[in-house]
Amino acid sequence: MSKKSTNKTNSKSLGLVTSSLSKIQQIMLLCLPFCLFFSYHPVIPIFSTSTTNFELSIPLLWLLIFAILSLPENFRLYINSLRVVIKAKSHTNKTPRPSSRHKTDKFYPHFLRLFTLIYPFFVTINSIGSPNFLRAILTSGVIWCICLSLLTILQNISQYKTQIGKSFNKNLLIAGTLASAFCWLQSILDIAGVPREFTFLCKGCISTVFGFPHPNGFAIESQFMANLLLAPIFLSLFYLLERPKNHLSKLNSDPYPASKLGHFLRFGLPLFLIATLYLTLSRGAIFSFWVSVFVLFIYQIVKLIKQKSCRREILFRQPLIFSAVVFLPLFFTLSAQGLFTELGPTSHTFFNGVSTSVSQLSLGCIDLAKVFHKTNENNESHETHETHETHESNKLHLSDLNTDAAASVQKAPQFTSYIEESTNIRLNLNRLALSSWRTSLRRMLAGVGLGAAGLTLYQEFPELGSPKEIIQNEYLAILYEQGICGVIMIICAAILFVLTYKLHNKNHEKISIYGRVLALSFALTLCFFSGLPNALHIYLLTPLLFLL
């Protein structure tokens, strides 16, 4: 209550009308972590065109409802700011006098509020001339909903921090744990032969692809499930590596129960979540996680070195801790993937499964199958001559087997090592988009139009095969569709959102290093995919940066 009154006092001193969250909005914020993990299943298909599939998911429904609930309050605040600015301008025109610093400070929040919607207005204008008008309008609508929701959250996060902060973080950990458990269940059911329609596995996620399943949870693909796990992973690492300095703090108090179970969860939950991340075999999310953990490791080392009272054993312990965080779940998941391959429907063995996974994660640089083959090459060549006659007789015998027996023989998986073609397709799309973007100055400045990337690329490069092919890089997609102007606008919007948070939260705390590495991890993953529906969690989990 004191924080809320303090926030109101600060706002009144600035001449700013305050806002507040309704009970429904508070409940929706607490439900947000659970909604985000149902990013595709269940889905409501609306209609489909030659360029786009229009579907409604639970996160999109959450966003739409929250934005609608936020609209009346935001409309009232914007109208008030507009009146203040117009009144101040008319008063200045009548009695011109040098503006004082006090007046500047008084009108600053109103100008800031009015400018926060500059990016949604820009994309709306940009969508008018888009070749893919329907997709453009719907995309601009999603952007409007995101901006309105973020403004509402950032304007109120400080006064509700102690009320919903711990519960929000706890719910995020619970949601991540349940989703991870479902991923392992998906894998087990797939190995047991349960049809894909019942397991919700995508076509490219089943065991016949690599020999072991790489689950997608309730997401459309495994890479999006892996991306969703990043937030609970870094939150669990926060509670593992950073013990709350003030145990009486409502915000940073430990979400785990004060028992042996809580102690086990503190250490086991991060490892379980990271193991699930490896199980998805999403290179984009895994590489982003590795980079962010390395940055976190460097930060911890520098922080300990700066402490004069730091003991050497504590400093030397850090590499062991971070190595355990990264490699223990990796070894566990590799063993599980090998076991799934051994028990799965393909002819591959435990070693083949481990080799395939390592080859994928190393981009083909480490091929255990080739290394093992070279070490046994001499022995195999020596035995080949002695068993030549036996093989010939076996061939004659196999030719006499009936077709039913031949059909029952297990087949090898579709891929047994790093799929270079997958990476080449993504890189080729990026190259084609850049070459198309550079064809005219107008296109470089304003882009091809919101939502028109797939259609434009298909018209200029029919060999792509479908206008539904999109650029698998969010930054490049923004540059191609909205041009340099769009990039500048979105950077300005990000700055305005940060200033809005600082304005409404005068006693704001510095963002925790864990929030920063999470933001870094999210930023890196956007290099591997694009599309607002698949990236909603990146924008809607922004409050987490201020709750740590």
Go through each PLM region and give its residues:
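A membrane-periplasm/extracellular boundary helix in multi-pass inner-membrane enzymes
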Residues: 72, 181, 187-190, 279, ...
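Hydrophobic transmembrane alpha-helices and their immediate junctions
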Residues: 481-521
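N-terminal signal-anchor transmembrane segment
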Residues: 3-4, 8-81, 122-129
